[in-house]
Amino acid sequence: METTLYNGEDVIVNKTSYVLFSPKRNQIIAFYPEAQDEEETTNSDSMIHIRRVAGLPGEKVQIKNGKLYINGEEQKEKYDFEAMHSGGRAVNEITLKDDEYFVLSDSRNDMDDSRNSSFTKVTKKNIIGKVILRLDPFSLIGGPTAEDKKTE
């Protein structure tokens, strides 16, 4: 499975997507990292993260044998992602808070996502919006699906 988006690619984010609604599983979201203290600013464009929503508020998330489980049920993923070599902090079941999301990188063994204990918490207040379109590179213009392949 190739990465859906690469560093430096330009995307369009719908900032109104989640004004009335909440992110859904499998949607690709853009978000700022959570501030570690009140003086830290988190709204710099260079700090924007883009990941796929895997777990929703209040759900129990676990990764075992390379598979994602939500509330004890194995999830049949929409795309053909590689099996995860490590569940990180999700080896043990995690219960998400009422405003917390569990996100995964499409490059499943990257570990730069909610499995990593040092990765930022993703809460609704930090979500910028839904990634709806890739603009650059021009050869891959279109929706940011996991089926897209990087061309040489």
Residues covered by each model-derived region:
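Extended hydrophobic leader/signal-anchor segments used for secretion and membrane insertion
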Residues: 1-152
